[in-house]
Each structure stands twice: as C-alpha cells, then as structure tokens.
C-alpha cells in the first residue's frame, strides 16, 4: 500500500463529492441558483421540489454515483490495501458534498451520497438501507424524518455485519446527518416541515384538507 497513492485517492474522492450537482443542473437547465429557492438546499429533495421530477431524479442519481465512484476509486486504480480504505474514500466524498470546495465549503446534507457510499462498499448493506428508508418515506411522507430515523436503525443493524469500520463510518454519518438536519428537526417539532407529494401521511392530509402550501423555509 502506497500512502501517497491513497492520499491522492482521498483528495480525488473529496473533489468528486464536492461536485455541486443540484447547483449546476439549476444553472445550466433553468438559469437559476437552486440555493435561492425552496429550502435553499442543493440536494435531491429541494431539486425535486424546485426543478421537478426529471431534474430531481438526475440530481439523485448523480449524487448517489458520486459516493459510489469515490468509494470504489481504490479498486478502479487497482490499489492494494485494507478494505476499510474504501470507506475512508467514501467518507471523503461525503465531506466533499457537505463542505464543497466549489461552494465556499458549503453544501448539502449528503443523504444520497451516503447511500452511494454504501452501494459501493457493500451491496447487501445498501439493500438493507433501501429496505429501511423507502417504507419509512412511504409511511411518513417526510424525507428528513425518514432519513434521521433510518440512519439510527441502519447504524444499529450495522453491528450484524461484523465490520467495525462500517459501523464506525455509519455512526459518523448518523451524527453528521443529525447536525445537518438541525433546521429540519426544528420544523418537524413545529409541524412546519414540508412533505413530499406521495405516501400515507400525504394522502391522509390531502383527503382531510390539511395540506398547506409549501413555504420557502431557509
């Protein structure tokens, strides 16, 4: 294992994670800065809300692939070393997305990019994440709540994989997600958080006339 080679890999992984997908899609195709609309976030949820399902899907796929590509860089370049180094590369991508060098070290909440890291590292663990998150989203209609509850469950489940480094990285991701979702947590407590236009809770509120027009929460 070459320390210099891995250092370069980690830097490249950070730069890949820093790629501001939502901002670029907004500016190139809509001539607007997504940071000035909706929640102001550059990630998937705000992209769907502000730019529509096609652009939102593109942002989702690219942000997931950022995490996957960064995680698998050591494999792509045929570098030898412990498998946990893939997780470190993935963590660098998450840091890049959250603190992008291209956005003055600001960025998104890294939910999609974190999913991409799990996809690149352990397909079964990624499948577990999907099985936890998607039903949670369908039930609650809240992306933020689903993300926070899911990462806690996923962290607990990580112990069953007997991979201490996976558990450590998942724990760090959990802390980071809670920190990055501080404003969402406040809105959830105050019943002001926006919901997605599908799922059981959305359909319940719609059928009872309880839906409110989305506010531009910052």
Curated annotation (Swiss-Prot):
This is Glycerol-3-phosphate acyltransferase 2. It is a multi-pass membrane protein. It comes from Lactobacillus johnsonii (strain CNCM I-12250 / La1 / NCC 533). InterPro entries: G3P_acylTferase_PlsY. Pathway: Lipid metabolism; phospholipid metabolism. PANTHER family: GLYCEROL-3-PHOSPHATE ACYLTRANSFERASE-RELATED (PTHR30309:SF0), INNER MEMBRANE PROTEIN YGIH (PTHR30309). Its EC number is 2.3.1.275. It catalyses: an acyl phosphate + sn-glycerol 3-phosphate = a 1-acyl-sn-glycero-3-phosphate + phosphate. One of its GO terms (cellular component) is plasma membrane. Probably interacts with PlsX. Pfam families: G3P_acyltransf.
């Amino acid at each position: 294992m070459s320390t210099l080679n891995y250092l370069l890999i980690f830097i490249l992984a950070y730069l890949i994670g820093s790629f501001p997908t939502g901002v670029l899609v907004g500016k190139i195709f809509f001539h607007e800065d997504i940071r000035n609309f909706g929640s102001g976030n550059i990630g998937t949820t705000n992209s769907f809300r502000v730019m529509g399902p096609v652009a939102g899907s593109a942002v989702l796929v690219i942000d997931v692939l950022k995490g996957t590509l960064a995680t698998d860089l050591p494999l792509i370049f045929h570098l030898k070393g412990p498998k946990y180094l893939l997780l470190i590369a993935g963590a660098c991508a998450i840091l890049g997305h959250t603190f992008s060098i291209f956005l003055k070290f600001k960025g998104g909440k890294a939910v999609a990019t974190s999913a991409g890291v799990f996809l690149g590292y352990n397909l079964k663990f990624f499948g577990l994440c999907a099985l936890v998150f998607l039903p949670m989203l369908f039930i609650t209609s809240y992306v933020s709540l689903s993300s926070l509850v899911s990462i806690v469950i996923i962290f607990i489940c990580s112990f069953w994989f007997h991979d201490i480094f996976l558990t450590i990285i998942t724990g760090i991701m959990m802390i980071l997600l809670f920190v990055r979702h501080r404003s969402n947590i406040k809105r959830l407590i105050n019943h002001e958080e926006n919901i997605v236009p599908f799922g059981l809770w959305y359909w319940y509120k719609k059928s009872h006339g309880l839906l409110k027009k989305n506010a531009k929460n910052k």
